[in-house]
């Protein structure tokens, strides 16, 4: 709904994008299925420009919510504050739409720098270090080529082994653990970015 990234590029309209992965309803209630949401928003004022959602259950409801925000000229801050009836079979206390707004706010407020897979693909790998913050078991199932594994669940002292003369790109499966790792590293003086969407 709204304007796609491809169209924004074609129209040369500046935008940022946030990608989140969330459950269709409360995770403790049986049958929760993951959905993916991507929002495009203005880097100046956070105006919501477009949204996409992929999944099986509840995607239509999320797109309707975001369509209403776009139609009313709303922003990512409106996504953060959107409320709907809470019932575990239908939604979570913090809906994936809310989470998309929170991620976008983190980007605009400077709480964390994000990088897209397209930007990562074009980076000079000699100037970055890829750090997969998932568990060792998850890392063993596959990761981005050249990444090292320093689990967020492990000792935070492990992070001090990272070089400070390179940009650290952290990532996980969804983006949350990458965000936490990025915040920890930022507080220790590292130049760090989180891979958008995990």
Set out the residue ranges of the language-model regions.
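Flexible, glycine-rich terminal cap/loop adjacent to redox cofactors
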Residues: 10-110
